[in-house]
Each structure stands twice: as structure tokens, then as C-alpha cells.
Amino acid sequence: MAAIRMGKLTTMPAGLIYASVSVHAAKEEESKKQLVKPEQLPIYTAPPLQSKYVEEQPGHLQMGFASIRTATGCYIGWCKGVYVFVKNGIMDTVQFGKDAYVYMKNPPRDFLPKMGVITVSGLAGLVSARKGSKFKKITYPLGLATLGATVCYPVQSVIIAKVTAKKIYATSQQIFGAVKSLWTKSSKEESLPKPKEKTKLGSSSEIEVPAKTTHVLKHSVPLPTELSSEAKTKSESTSDVQISEVGGKIIGTWGPNVTNSGVLRI
């Protein structure tokens, strides 16, 4: 019995050690399996070495919608502008009516007399221009009504006059600048010199030399020592020396680099 107990005691630690070793080995295998990169899995393909982006071409349906949108875009914008203009006009008119109603509901004390003065002045202008031309029929009532309004509302009339004068001045300055720019442009174009035709000018030092010579001496002519030395020095500095006889005179001509020519008499 004692031997059996000792055997059990010796076998239990060995079993525990084996179990712990197997568990540790299993954990290491699991950790190794978890450290695998996603690119190394068989479900992924190797990326190409050289890739190029290709833009997707629009189809027929997309091109059709684009052409319709571009064709109707300007008309839609014009309709939107008209709608906004009409809407703002209606809103301003409604607001003006509301303000006028509130003002007329509780008018100040001097409102009715002032309106009476303006109305009477306008009617007086209409009556005075009854037998006149159309211009008088328009200007007389407006002028007298404006005069009556100026008398009744001097402060507002001064403000309106200042604003109108500023607008007129700005418009006149713009017109003056446009006319001035056109005038300066036209004056600059007129002041520019016209291109002249190229003319061939001959210098006064150029002298025409006849191509034909009467007679060229083939035999040598004895020259004095001074002239021979000059001829030698000139022949050294030039490329051509030609001696000709014209009318009993011996003429020596040098090349183009020599300015003087020698004349000898026999």
C-alpha cells in the first residue's frame, strides 16, 4: 500500500508538469497564428507593381443629361432672376401700402394742409398748360407740384436734391471718362508715325569704277625707286594691284582696302 501511495505521489507532479508544458506550447502556437499579417493570407492577391489611374468615361445617358442641363441653364437663371425681381417688387409694394395705411390712419396735424397745397399747385400747373403743347402739359403740373412739395417739406427736399445731384455727378464723370479714353486713344493712333519705306542711300564717298579698261599692260614697266617702294608697301597691305594704260597714262589701282590710287605718266 505504501508503494502504491508513493507511486501516486510521484506520478501526479509529472502529470501536472506535462499538462502545463502542453498548455504553454498550445498558447505559443495560438500567439504565432495571431501574428500572421493580412497580406500573407491566401485570400489576398499581390498588388501590381505599376498602377495607372484611368478616369471613367461618361456614358450616353450622362452626356444627354449634361447637354440638356447646359442648354436650359441660361433660361433657368433668367427665370430665377425675373422671379426674384417680381417677388421683391411685390413685397416692397405691399410694405409701402402697409406703411401708408398706418401713416394715413394716424396722420400728423399738418399733413392734410400740406397735401392740399401740393394738389392745388399741381392742378394750377395743369390748368395753365391746358392750351399749350404736350411738353408744357407734362412739365407745368410736375414743376408746380414739386415746388409745392419743396415748400411744404424743405428738409426732405434738400436731402433728395443732394442725393440726385450726387448721382448725376457720378454719371457725368463716368460719361466724361469714357469719352476722354476714346479721345486719347484716337489721338495716340493719329500721332503714331507711319512706317516709312526702306530707301537705299548711297554714301558720297562711293565712286563707280567702269568695268571695261582700254588696255592692260602685260609687260613690266620700270618705275622710279620712290614709286616702286610705295607700290611695294601698298601691294603688301592689299590683295590686288592692277596697272592699266588710258590715254597715254599709266594708272595703278589697288584693292578695296586702299583709298588712294597712283597715276604715272610716261
Curated annotation (Swiss-Prot):
GO biological process, one term: cristae formation
Keywords: Membrane, Mitochondrion, Mitochondrion inner membrane, Phosphoprotein, Transit peptide, Transmembrane, Transmembrane helix
UniProt entry tagged with the keyword Aminoacyl-tRNA synthetase: no
Topological region Mitochondrial intermembrane: 28-110, 156-266
Transit peptide range per the UniProt entry: 1-27
Main location: mitochondrion
Modified residues (Phosphoserine): 204
Transmembrane segments: 111-129, 138-155
Protein's UniProt name: MICOS complex subunit MIC27
Organism placement in taxonomy: Eukaryota, Metazoa, Chordata, Craniata, Vertebrata
